[in-house]
């Protein structure tokens, strides 16, 4: 499958702002089941992009906006060829052993409520892979997915469970927190999801055809496997993996000291029409 992606982020600054340091994570990597055919990154500011890798091996670009300016616009655009690997990840850049991804963060803390939720999966299944699938099903049935901006600060694991509804990022936080409690390494993934029907002008499901978050968990004998509890399935050829970290903060597509953020995202089968999904958030 070939997926055409366009991701535009515009961030507002205080009028006359100068010397703003910016980091963007908007460049995916190739791995088994995902091949980057072409990819470009454009800015509305005349500055020099410095390419580098972060601690997790994500491709990043850093730059400084000298100013004065009141906004910054970043456009990532390209085409990716994907294949279905039944969610099993091979050929990804691995900077750390799986055990590092047992570490909790503020967004993935295993509170008593999260622990009780995770223990339900332990009671129904004995083997790690079965527990991960049971966890995905239970989460899908417990927390309703609601569309939310990728830059809007997903809920913590505890907040998502307590509210009973969350965007894909909050759901991924709950899955990773619960899996880590069970002793199964889990990590946060950002990326894109194309609709299954190439003729769909508009996505029929929330979060389809736009930026999305999901989780990967490590199962002995299998390795890393992607789990999208919001949709109750493992990754397919409709997913494009962008960045990996311990939680949503680590995969943020843009980090700076700006104010309001707006983004427009499309991720569609190259055979079908293109439709932009819009989001807006306040930092």
Segments predicted by a language model, with ranges:
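Linear, non-domain "peripheral" regions
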Residues: 1-119, 125
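Conserved structured core elements
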Residues: 3, 168-169
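N-terminal start-of-chain detector that recognizes signal peptides
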Residues: 11-15, 44-51, 158, 185-189, ...
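Short capping/connector residues at structural and topological boundaries
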Residues: 18, 70, 106-107, 165-166, ...
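Glycine-rich, small/acidic residue-mixed loop/short-helix segments
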Residues: 24-34, 39-41, 231-252, 256-261, ...
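Secondary-structure boundary elements
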Residues: 80-84, 89, 96-166, 174-176, ...
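Hydrophobic/aromatic-rich core segments of domains that either
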Residues: 170-260
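Intrinsically disordered, low-complexity linkers and terminal tails enriched in Pro/Gly
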Residues: 194-200, 276-283
């Amino acid at each position: 499958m070939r997926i055409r992606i366009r991701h535009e982020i515009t961030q507002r600054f205080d009028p006359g702002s100068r010397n703003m340091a910016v980091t963007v994570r908007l460049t995916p990597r190739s791995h088994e089941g995902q091949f980057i055919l072409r990819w470009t990154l454009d800015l509305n500011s005349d500055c020099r992009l410095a390419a580098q890798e972060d601690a997790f091996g994500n491709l990043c670009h850093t730059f400084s906006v000298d100013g004065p300016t009141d906004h910054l616009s970043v456009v990532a655009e390209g085409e990716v060829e994907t294949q279905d690997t039944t969610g099993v990840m091979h050929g990804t850049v691995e900077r750390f052993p799986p055990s590092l991804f047992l570490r909790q963060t503020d967004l993935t803390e295993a509170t008593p409520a999260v622990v009780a939720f995770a223990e339900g999966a332990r009671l129904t299944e004995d083997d790690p892979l079965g527990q991960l699938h049971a966890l995905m099903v239970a989460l899908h049935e417990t927390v309703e997915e609601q569309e939310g901006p990728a830059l809007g600060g997903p809920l913590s694991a505890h907040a998502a469970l307590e509210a009973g509804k969350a965007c894909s990022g909050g759901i991924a936080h709950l899955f990773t927190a619960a899996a880590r409690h069970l002793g199964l390494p889990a990590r946060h993934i950002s990326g894109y999801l194309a609709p299954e029907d190439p003729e769909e002008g508009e996505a029929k499901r929330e979060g389809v055809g736009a930026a999305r978050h999901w989780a990967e968990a490590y199962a002995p004998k299998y390795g890393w496997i992607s789990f999208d509890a919001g949709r109750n399935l493992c990754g397919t050829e409709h997913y494009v993996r962008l960045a990996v970290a311990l939680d949503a903060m680590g995969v943020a597509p843009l980090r700076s000291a700006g104010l309001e953020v707006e983004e427009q995202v499309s991720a569609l089968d190259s055979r079908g029409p293109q439709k932009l999904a819009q989001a807006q958030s306040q930092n």
